[in-house]
Amino acid sequence: DLDASEINLALADYVYLKGNFTGSLTGSQNGKQYAIYNLAKPLFENLKSGSTISNIDFKDVNIVGTYDSAALARNAENARITDVSVQGRVSVVGNASNVAGLVVNGTNTQITNSSFTGTILSNNQHIKAYNVGGLVASLKGGESLLSQSKADVTNISGARSNEQRIGGLVGRLENNARITKSY
């Protein structure tokens, strides 16, 4: 297991790992399951083509961001996320922004057998457009699929216009992205 609170982030750091990630991260080895505890920022900035995240738990997450926030990544493009669970709280303060439990923006990304349990808080002081989702704030592209996943989320939002979209699983689903067997 890894305790993210042992990593010193500067106030200006908005993620733990900046830039593009194209590798794989798995939380299991030799039959043992591992977790990352106490995330205070999203783990990745960008998951890019070929990246895979699997079999990992994020526990006691407490993220307070000022812009696009989620536990795993701000952006996932052509990524594969399987058997990932997040437990805790993710919030944005300041300017209205996108927020989700797992990934902020997913494009042509497949998320399978993953979950979020906890609270998502979005700023309610502005009327700027934003998306809030239990798992993904915005999921788009014909190759995007959210399947066999769930969110048990308390969503605290103060939407003031029809440009502020809030969903239990996904805040905004577009461009032929699909959800199957998820709740």
Predicted features, each with a name:
Residues D1-Y183:
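Surface-exposed repetitive/solenoidal architectures
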